[in-house]
Each structure stands twice: as C-alpha cells, then as structure tokens.
Amino acid sequence: MILEYIVTGNEMKLLDDTTSQVFLVPSVVLMEQAAAGVVRELVACFDKSKEFAVICGRGNNAGDGIAIARLLNQAGYRCMVYYAFGTDEAGSELFELQKNIYARYDFKVVSDIECVCKSDVIIDALFGTGLKRAIEGSLADVISSVNKTDAYRVAVDVPSGVDSDKGHVMGCTFKADFTYTFSYKKTGLLLWPGCDYCGLVKVVPIGIDDHSFCGNLPSVRALDESDLKKLDNRPAHSNKGTFGKLLVIAGSRNMAGAAVLSAKAAYKSGAGLVKIITPECNRSIIQCALPEALLCTDIASAKALETELDWADAVVIGPGLSKSDNAKMLVETVLKTAEIPLVIDADALNIISDNMTLLNEHKMPVIVTPHLGEMSRLMKKSIANIQEDIIGVAGEFASLYNVTCVLKDFRTIIAAADGEKFINLSGNCGMATAGSGDVLSGIVGGLLVQWRDTKKAAAYGAFIHGLAGDMVFDNTGSYGMIASDIIDGLDKVWIKVEKNGN
C-alpha cells in the first residue's frame, strides 16, 4: 500500500531541519514558499474587496504569517499585521527577519485588536506545531475576540491552541474556517476535538517531500479514494472458491441481526462463501434475510467447532454472540485451535476482557475491532484516558498482544503489531448506529479471506466501511442511516473500484 503520510509536530520539525541541513535548502526559502502557497489559496478564494489581518506570535509560525501579509499587500490586497506580543518583543531568527522585511515595505501594523476584528479575513499565525501549553490570559482574550467575529478565519499550519500531535485543545483555541497546513497533514488536525477547530484542511506544498524522511518514515498514514485504484479487479477465470470461505460465528437469541449484517457485508465485500455458526433459534430469520449464507447451528463442543474451522479460510467471531457459557467455549476454542486468520469483535472481545490470557493463545494473525467501551474493558483504562492518546493506545495494544487493532471512534485508528498505524478519514456521523460495527467486521473478514493480509484487510476494510456510509449519505442523511444502508453503499464502492481499476 502506498498511502498518505500523516506527521506529528516533531516529525515535521525534523523534516524542516533535514531539508535545510541535508539538502541545503535555506529555512527562509521554505518559509517564503509556505507563504506563497497560502497566498495562492487565499487569492483563489477572496477578491481584493476583502481586508485581511494577520495575528502574529513571535516564532516561525508568526514568520510565515508576516510573509503572507507582505505577499498579500504586494498582490494588491489590503492586509494589516497585529503583533500579539507587542512590536518590541524579540522572537525567533526567522520571525525577526520577516518582521524587518515587512517594516522596510512600511506596510500596515496595528496595535488594537478591534481593528483586526473589523477585517473580512483574519489569519492566525500566533502559535504553530510547537505549542505545548494552554493559551490563557491576554492571548486568550485576543483569540476569544476574533472567534466572536463574522470574519472568515484562516489558520496557518495549525489553529493556535490545537495540539498538533494528539488533537487536544489547549485553552482558548482559534476556530478556523480553513487551515492551510504545510507539506503533510498533522495528526492533531484529524483527531477529535482538535479537528472541530480546523474547518477545511488543505495541504500546501512548500518544497519538502518524502526525500527529507531519509528513510525514517512516519508511523502513521491514511488512505484516500485514490488508493482504491491500487486494488486489483477480480480475475475472470474464477469460481466461488477463488474468493475464500469465511466462517462467521455470531448471533444469539434475539440477536440474529448481528449475524446477518456481518455475513451479508462479507458477501458484499467479495467473499466467495460465508457460513454462519449461530443458535438454531436464529435459523428462520437468517435463511429469510440472507439465503446465500450457509448455516450451522447449535455447535455444542470444541470438536464440532474444529471441524468447521477446518473448512474455513478465516473467521469472524463475536457480533451478537452474548457471553453465555457456549459463547465462551466458542471463543476459547477458536483462539486455541484455529490455524487461520481471525477477526475478533463485540462479545468475543468482552469475553476476552475477563481473561486476557486468551488473547495470547492465537496461533495465526488476528484483527481485533473494539469500540472505545470494549477497549476500555480490554485495557482496563477509562474511555477518557484512551481518548487522550487514541493512536498510542491502539499501538500499545497491537504490540502487546501481537494483533492488528482497529480501534473504532470518530476517527478509527488501525494499528499493526509492527508499529505501522493508519487513521481512517472516511465515514460520517450517520454511521453511529446499531449494527455498524457488525458490518465492519464482515467487510474486514470478507477482504481477509481474499487477500490473506491482516494489515491490508483492516486498513482498507475500515476505509471502505466509511466510504460506503459516505456513498449513501445523500440518500439517508445522518438521522436516517441504518447499518443495512451501509451494506447497500458497498455496491457503489466496488463499482467505483472496478471502473477505476487496472
């Protein structure tokens, strides 16, 4: 997979330093290119009737802001600069350079925040990716005043107050309509709650590319729709066995729907054969809802289950399973004896959370798909603590138990045991509905039996799940979407894949 890199603030600083020190590109050249890139975007959005104001701190982010103000003035726009720390406060070397250049042109500087608040477009260049403390006091007053205006608000690289690594909001935070970030998206711009302050995020190239990693690639990446083009079309010379046999162990009394959703999503993701293991009481419901599924009911012994495991190429276990004694037997048997890849979801995770040693029993690759509540039980951490560092927690769990972890939230995080991580950027709030997780487990399982690659199945599975929800959003809206709508969206995704494929 060739995916979009997502960087932390520290990684971006290293890229800046490497570009200057190894490739000999002066830092001021990068700053000028950053400013020019932002100005190109602004000129494309706003005509010369608009008045601009740039709020500057005293670091390199402020240097970017001053350069933006200069270039806007030179392009015939009206733009003022407001120095939040005062005109006499010393700052970084590049800040001082840009401040002196701006002064030579004698462009407008104001000392009254009220002048700024009367502008049509207000640009935040107060703090960049290096901010590690809460914004309080007079600086908070400045941001608060600006946030109350009707002006368009633009952030340079990151909105001031957003932690560029974890998405925390640190004190009073600039509320942007647009964020122009440099070279690569920052993790904090994508995670909640920081993402709520970013508006539309656009990457502005400044002359830094993958060469500057010097082999030290970031651990976090993301998929987008262009990555669907990397998926191969199904071969014409094939049969149902070509595309894998998936065993879905799901459902309990009154929970037949979970089995149906997971199995149907697997079929709609290309699995050749899907067999459902479920209680006999679910037979009529499942056969009516999904006649394509094979059915095996009332597995009462480990030996009987092992026979079914021998048939399959991969297993999904957990949706609607309950925590009954029989369910516990099924989970324990799968973990101890299965010699095929596993997708573990829902009640199977809840069973494991009562006896974490079970997760050390697996012989083959495992994908776990917990939501925050299930991860809280698995890790014995509060949901709040998990949200403080959702990428780190997913990575820790994956490494600790040698699994691929799909941690479901507003931004689902996929973490592999080898340290590689993905942020899923597809999906919408309509997908926060009963059964959505069952659909995800089926998609991942359906891809897994075809590809036999847990990392690829997990990353693409999460992305395709979200994209399917996006595909049907116009028809359902956020209030009307249900899990089966997401399955309907899979048809649209695969049509797109086949039209754009090789």
Residue positions per predicted region:
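Small-residue (G/A/S/T)-rich helix-start motifs and N-terminal tracts that mark the onset
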Residues: 1-80, 189-342, 346, 350-367, ...
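Nucleotide and nucleotide-moiety/phosphate-recognizing core
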Residues: 39-125, 134-156
